[in-house]
C-alpha cells in the first residue's frame, strides 16, 4: 500500500524489476503513490511483487527483443493511458573474466542487454514521455567511470549507459523530458550474492565488498529506489547527471596493485 504521495498518479515502468535493485526501485515508487509496471523476463519474481504490491502490475518482457519492448509500451498505455517515467534497470554483471577469456559474442550479448535494451525502451517510450514531460532514469554503475578488474565488457557497457544519458539529456531538454542516471556501487543483491558464491572464500569476498566503502557497509536496493524517486519527483532542475549511490567507494586513495606484487621501495636515510 502506498504510504506517500510524492509521485501520486504517475505511471512508471521499471525493467529488471523482479528482484534486486529493480525490486527496490519498484517498492519505492509504489510507496510514493505511483502505478508501476514491473518488466522482467523472469516471471516468478515479477508475479510475486505484483501480488504483494497494490498499484504494481507485471508484464513479461525481454528488453533485448524489440517486439517485447513494443508490447510493454503499448500495454502500459492501454492500461494506464500515460507514461511518466522509465527506469532502465535490466542488466547483468558476468562473473570475473580476464580479457583473454572474453569473446566477441559474449560482449555483443551483454551490449544487447545492458546498453541496447536501455536504448530501445527509451526510444519507444519517448513519444509518451514528451506528452507528460516525464523523465528517464538509467541504472549505470560506478565502475563505468572508475573501471573494474576482470570486467572489460561490463565496464564498457555501463560507461556507455552514462554517456548515452548525457547525450539524450541534451536532445530531450527541448521537450521537457529529463534524463539522468544512477551509478550504484556495492549494493547487496541476489546478483552480488551469486557472484560471491563463485569465489574461493565467499565470506572474505563479501567482507571485502563491505569494506570498500568508507561507510563500512554495502548499500541496499531500497536506497537506490529512494534515489530514483528523488530524481523523478523533486529533482526538477537535474538533467544529464550521474547520481552516485556508492557509500563513498570512489573517494580517497587505496591499494590498487596486488599485495603480492614485488616492489623496490626506496630506503629512507636515517
From Swiss-Prot:
Enzyme Commission number, as recorded: 1.1.1.122
CC terms in the record's Gene Ontology section: cytosol
Annotated NAD(+) binding sites: 19, 21, 40-41, 62-63, 89, 154, 158, 187, 189, 191
Catalytic residue positions: 154 (proton acceptor)
Domain of life of the source: Eukaryota
Coiled coil stretches, renumbered: none
Effect seen on changing residue 158 to A: Lacks of activity of testosterone 17-beta-dehydrogenase (NADP+) and estradiol 17-beta-dehydrogenase [NAD(P)+] activities
SUPFAM superfamilies: NAD(P)-binding Rossmann-fold domains
pH dependence: Optimum pH is 8.5 to 9.0.
Family: Belongs to the short-chain dehydrogenases/reductases (SDR) family.
Protein name: L-fucose dehydrogenase
Native organism: Homo sapiens (Human)
Amino acid at each position: 500500500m502506498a504510504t506517500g504521495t510524492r509521485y501520486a498518479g504517475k505511471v512508471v515502468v521499471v525493467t529488471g524489476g523482479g528482484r534486486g535493485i529493480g525490486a527496490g526501485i519498484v517498492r519505492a515508487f509504489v510507496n510514493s503513490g505511483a502505478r508501476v509496471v514491473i518488466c522482467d523476463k523472469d516471471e516468478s519474481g515479477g508475479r510475486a511483487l505484483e501480488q504483494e504490491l497494490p498499484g504494481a502490475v507485471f508484464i513479461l518482457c525481454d528488453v533485448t527483443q524489440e517486439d517485447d519492448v513494443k508490447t510493454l509500451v503499448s500495454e502500459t498505455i492501454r492500461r494506464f493511458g500515460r507514461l511518466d517515467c522509465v527506469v532502465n534497470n535490466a542488466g547483468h554483471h558476468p562473473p570475473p573474466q580476464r580479457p583473454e577469456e572474453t569473446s566477441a559474442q559474449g560482449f555483443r550479448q551483454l551490449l544487447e542487454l545492458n546498453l541496447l535494451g536501455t536504448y530501445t525502451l527509451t526510444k519507444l517510450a519517448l513519444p509518451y514521455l514528451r506528452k507528460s514531460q516525464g523523465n528517464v532514469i538509467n541504472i549505470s554503475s560506478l565502475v563505468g567511470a572508475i573501471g573494474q578488474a576482470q570486467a572489460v565488457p561490463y565496464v564498457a557497457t555501463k560507461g556507455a549507459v552514462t554517456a548515452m544519458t548525457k547525450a539524450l539529456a541534451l536532445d530531450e531538454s527541448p521537450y521537457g523530458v529529463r534524463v539522468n542516471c544512477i551509478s550504484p556501487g556495492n549494493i547487496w543483491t541476489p546478483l552480488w550474492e551469486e557472484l560471491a558464491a563463485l569465489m574461493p572464500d565467499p565470506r572474505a569476498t563479501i567482507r571485502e565488498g563491505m569494506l570498500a566503502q568508507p561507510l563500512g557497509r554495502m548499500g541496499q536496493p531500497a536506497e537506490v529506489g529512494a534515489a530514483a524517486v528523488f530524481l523523478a519527483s523533486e529533482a526538477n532542475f537535474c538533467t544529464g547527471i550521474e547520481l552516485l549511490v556508492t557509500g563513498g567507494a570512489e573517494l580517497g586513495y587505496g591499494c590498487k596493485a596486488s599485495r603480492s606484487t614485488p616492489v623496490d621501495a626506496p630506503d629512507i636515510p636515517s
